[in-house]
């Protein structure tokens, strides 16, 4: 079985056109971390530049500034690396081109493998990978396996830091480099192999039974986020649902989990 972990950093913003409002991500760094059992891990790192036109930048100026300072520590006007990939000047075309390049690399990495598990940790890359429909691949969000955040992992597991590396593109000391994050998540996956690989082995609980289980847990548990009717609680509610299944040893595939989220309007 081939395991593939993907992480994408870039500038996410709102794009307004004749089709309405669209949330898109213009990539700046992409890391694809992949390995098989009893083999050394391999890493593919891609850098991008361009792709943010003046209108897109102006509309999302405040959001881009926040992302630069607090998330990935890239700047819009930084000089591209010698091996950086130039994106089209039109933002929508840049978005499509970035996705296409990632798809092509994933196809190349996964070809000739009969069993593939594509892993991601939240983020838009999960939707991208699902839309690619890679042959023989199952897509799994690590959040749905109750994998802690990278920040929590490095606080609880100091040995994760000593053996994890980053790249010089980010402010030193930042834990938001995709290379660093993939190394940390790889450590967690190694320690939780049975949970991760179990995704491919266990049959999923049917939708109707999964809903009944969650309804039962809502009625039985005293402290849960569904007691607060607020959109701000949506992510906590999604995490709580996923945690209930994992803690009780119940496997629910991504399609059924998404249907449950939709049932409770957790968009």
Curated annotation (Swiss-Prot):
GO terms for biological process: symbiont-mediated suppression of host cytoplasmic pattern recognition receptor signaling pathway via inhibition of RIG-I activity. Keywords: Early protein, Host-virus interaction, Inhibition of host innate immune response by virus, Inhibition of host RIG-I by virus, Inhibition of host RLR pathway by virus, Viral immunoevasion. Induction: Expressed in the early phase of the viral replicative cycle. Disulfide bonds: none annotated. Belongs to the asfivirus I267L family. Plays a role in the inhibition of host RNA Pol-III-RIGI-mediated innate antiviral response. Mechanistically, interacts with host E3 ubiquitin ligase RNF135, disrupting RNF135-RIGI interaction and impairing RNF135-mediated 'Lys-63'-polyubiquitination and activation of RIGI. Interacts with host RNF135. This is Protein I267L.
């Amino acid at each position: 079985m081939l395991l593939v972990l993907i992480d994408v950093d870039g500038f996410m913003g709102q794009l307004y056109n004749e089709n309405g409002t669209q949330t898109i991500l213009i990539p700046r760094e992409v890391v694809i971390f992949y390995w098989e059992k009893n083999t050394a891990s391999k890493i593919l790192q891609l850098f991008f530049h361009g792709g943010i036109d003046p209108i897109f930048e102006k509309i999302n100026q405040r959001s881009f500034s926040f992302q630069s300072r607090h998330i990935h520590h890239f700047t819009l006007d930084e000089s591209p690396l010698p091996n950086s990939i130039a994106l089209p000047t039109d933002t929508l075309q840049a978005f499509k081109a970035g996705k296409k390049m990632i798809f092509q690399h994933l196809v190349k990495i996964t070809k000739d493998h009969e069993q593939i598990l594509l892993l991601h940790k939240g983020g838009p890359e999960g939707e991208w990978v699902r839309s690619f429909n890679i042959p023989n691949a199952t897509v799994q969000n690590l959040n749905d396996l109750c994998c802690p955040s990278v920040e929590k992992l490095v606080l609880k597991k100091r040995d994760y830091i000593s053996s994890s590396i980053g790249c010089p593109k980010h402010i030193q000391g930042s834990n938001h480099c995709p290379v660093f994050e993939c190394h940390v998540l790889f450590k967690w996956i190694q320690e939780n192999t049975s949970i991760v690989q179990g995704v491919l082995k266990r049959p999923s609980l049917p939708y109707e039974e999964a809903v009944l289980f969650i309804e039962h847990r809502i009625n039985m548990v005293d402290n849960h986020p569904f007691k607060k009717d607020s959109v701000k609680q949506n992510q906590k509610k999604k995490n709580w649902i996923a945690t209930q299944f994992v803690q009780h040893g119940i496997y629910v595939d991504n399609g059924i989990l998404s249907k449950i989220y939709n049932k409770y309007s957790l968009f």
